[in-house]
A protein has these predicted regions:
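Short alpha-helical transmembrane segments in multi-pass integral membrane proteins
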Residues: 1-18, 76-143, 185-241, 297-364, ...
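N-terminal transmembrane alpha-helices
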Residues: 5-43, 56-71, 75, 100-107, ...
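Transmembrane helical elements of multi-pass membrane transporters/channels
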Residues: 16-35, 137, 148, 171, ...
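Helix-terminus/linker motif at the lipid-water interface of multi-pass membrane proteins
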Residues: 30-49, 118-125, 181-188, 248-277, ...
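Small-residue hotspots at the loop-to-helix junctions and early N-terminal turns
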Residues: 45-56, 135, 194, 266-281, ...
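Small-residue-rich hydrophobic transmembrane alpha-helices
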Residues: 48-108, 145-164, 271-335, 368-390
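Short runs within selected transmembrane alpha-helices of multi-pass transporters and secretion channels
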Residues: 69, 137-156, 164-172, 193-208, ...
C-alpha cells in the first residue's frame, strides 16, 4: 500500500495519496459532529454549548500531539525519499518515546488545570457542570489520540494513506453507534457522548499501532537498535517542537477567541459550536490536501528532485483553489439548512448567528486553502519556523481584531467573524513574499528537471 511519490504523474500522485487522507479526516469530523448533532437535538442548548466549548479546548490539546507527530512525519518522509532505512528506524524510535512522554505530561496537566480552564474560557454558570463532566471523561482519550496520530503520520510518510482511513472508518461508525446508545438508550447525557468518543479513539489508536508493528519492517526493526545518537534525538525534537508550536499557537488563538465568544452568552456559544463544526468540515479537504502535498514535497526533497517539486507546486495551487471556490459557494448558499442539522428549527437566534458566521468565513476559503499549502511547503523544506511565523501572523491578527472590533457596540460579535479571513490573507501575503524572495535557495534548479 506504500506509494512512492517521487515517481509517476505529479498531479495524479498527489490526488491519489490525498483522497484517503481527506476521507479519513472527514470521518474524524464525524466524531465531533456525532456528539454535536445528538447532543444538540436530544440534550438541549446548554449541553450543546458545553460540548462545543470542550471541542475547542480538545482541539487545542490534540494540536500539540498532532504537531509533534506531523513534524516527525515530515522527517520520516525525507528519510524515505533519501532511501535511508537506518535513519528512518532511528527517527521512529526517538520520536515515539519523546512524543509518548510529552503525551503523558500533557494528560496530567490537563487534569490539574481542569477548573482553571473553565474560568479561562469564561464558561457561563449554567454550562459549567456539563462541561466539567464532559472534559473529565474526554481527557482519558488523549493517549489514544497519540497512538493513532503517531502511527498514521508514519504510514502516510511512507506513502500509505489507506490504512489510517480503514481504522478511522471503523472507529467513526462505532462512535456514532455508541453515541446513540449512551445518550438516547442509557440516558447518560454529555458523559455518554464523551465515553463514546474515548472508546472509538482507543480502538483506532491501538488498532493502527498493532498493524504497524506487524506489517511495517521499519517499526519492527526498532527492537534491534542498541542506542540512539543524541544528534538524531535533537533533530527530531527541534523539528517536531517547531511544528507543535505552529499547531498549538494556531489553536491557542482559536481557544482565546472561544473565551471571547462565550462572553456573548449561550446563544452565541451554541451558534459558534455548531458553525465551527460545519466550517471545519467544509475546509477539511484542503487542509488534508495541504498535508498530502507536504508529504509529496518532503519525499522529493529527500530525493533532491526539485524540478518535480516545482511542478507539484503549480498543480497543488490549481487543485486547492478550484476546490475552495466550489466549497465557498456551497457554504454560502446552504448556510441555513446546514445550521438546522445541528440546531432545532425553532432556535431562530442561534441559527441566525451561525448563518452569519458561515457566510463570512465561507466566502474566503481560498485564503485558508493557500495558507495550508504554505504550512505544508515550509514544513517539508525543513523550514518549520516559517510555518510558526505565518501562524503567529494569522492568529495574532485574528485575536487582536476580534477583541478590538467586538468591543465596538455597532460591530459586536460580527467583528469576531471578520477577524478570521483578514488574518488568513495577511499570513498568505507574508508566506508568498518570503517564497518569492527565497525561491532559488529553497528550490535550486536542476540541470535536468525530473518528472
Amino acid at each position: 500500500m506504500n506509494r512512492d511519490l517521487t515517481k509517476g504523474s505529479v498531479t495524479k500522485s498527489m490526488l491519489l495519496f490525498a483522497i484517503p487522507m481527506i476521507l479519513g479526516d472527514l470521518l474524524q469530523q464525524c466524531y465531533n459532529i456525532a456528539d454535536t448533532l445528538i447532543v444538540g437535538q436530544f440534550l438541549g442548548r446548554n449541553a450543546l454549548a458545553a460540548v462545543g466549548s470542550s471541542f475547542t479546548l480538545m482541539t487545542f490539546l490534540t494540536s500539540i500531539i498532532l504537531g509533534l507527530c506531523m513534524g516527525s512525519g515530515a522527517l520520516f518522509s525525507i528519510r524515505f525519499g533519501q532511501r535511508d532505512e537506518n535513519g528512518l528506524c532511528e527517527d521512529i524510535c526517538a520520536s515515539f518515546y519523546s512524543i509518548a512522554a510529552a503525551t503523558v505530561l500533557l494528560n496530567v496537566i490537563a487534569y490539574l488545570c481542569l477548573d482553571a480552564l473553565r474560568v479561562f474560557l469564561h464558561v457561563p454558570d449554567e454550562v459549567c457542570g456539563d462541561m466539567r463532566a464532559y472534559l473529565f471523561v474526554i481527557f482519558m482519550g488523549i493517549p489514544g489520540i497519540f497512538l493513532y496520530n503517531f502511527f498514521a503520520s508514519f504510514l502516510r510518510s511512507v506513502g500509505n494513506s489507506v490504512v489510517p482511513l480503514v481504522f478511522l472508518t471503523v472507529s467513526a461508525v462505532l462512535n456514532i453507534v455508541l453515541d446513540l446508545w449512551f445518550i438516547i438508550g442509557l440516558k447518560r447525557g454529555v458523559v455518554g457522548a464523551a465515553e463514546a468518543t474515548v472508546i472509538a479513539q482507543y480502538l483506532s489508536g491501538i488498532g493502527i499501532a498493532v498493524y504497524a508493528l506487524l506489517r511495517c519492517p521499519q517499526v519492527r526493526s526498532i527492537r534491534r537498535l542498541r542506542s540512539l545518537r543524541w544528534s538524531r534525538i535533537s533533530e527530531i525534537l527541534s523539528f517536531s517542537t517547531l511544528t507543535c508550536v505552529q499547531q498549538s499557537v494556531m489553536n491557542l488563538g482559536i481557544l482565546t477567541v472561544q473565551g471571547l465568544v462565550n462572553s456573548f452568552g449561550t446563544v452565541v456559544m451554541a451558534a459558534f459550536a455548531a458553525a465551527v463544526k460545519i466550517d471545519a468540515f467544509a475546509y477539511m479537504p484542503v487542509q488534508d490536501f495541504g498535508n498530502a502535498f507536504s508529504t509529496f514535497i518532503a519525499q522529493n526533497y529527500g530525493a533532491r528532485k526539485t524540478g518535480r517539486i516545482r511542478s507539484g507546486l503549480k498543480s497543488a495551487v490549481c487543485v486547492s483553489m478550484a476546490f475552495c471556490l466550489v466549497i465557498s459557494a456551497l457554504v454560502f448558499v446552504f448556510a441555513r439548512p446546514l445550521m438546522t442539522i445541528f440546531v432545532e428549527a425553532g432556535e431562530a437566534e442561534i441559527i441566525q448567528a451561525g448563518v452569519q458566521y458561515l457566510r463570512i468565513e465561507g466566502a474566503f476559503y481560498c485564503g485558508i486553502g493557500c495558507l495550508f499549502l504554505l504550512y505544508g511547503l515550509y514544513r517539508a523544506l525543513e523550514k518549520p519556523g516559517m510555518s510558526v511565523v505565518l501562524t503567529v501572523i494569522s492568529l495574532g491578527t485574528r485575536v487582536a481584531l476580534a477583541y478590538l472590533l467586538s468591543a465596538i457596540p455597532a460591530v459586536g460579535v460580527v467583528g469576531i467573524w471578520w477577524s478570521v479571513p483578514i488574518g488568513w490573507f495577511l499570513a498568505d501575503m507574508t508566506g508568498l513574499l518570503y517564497f518569492k524572495i527565497r525561491k532559488n535557495k529553497l528550490l535550486p534548479l536542476e540541470k535536468a528537471s525530473i518528472r
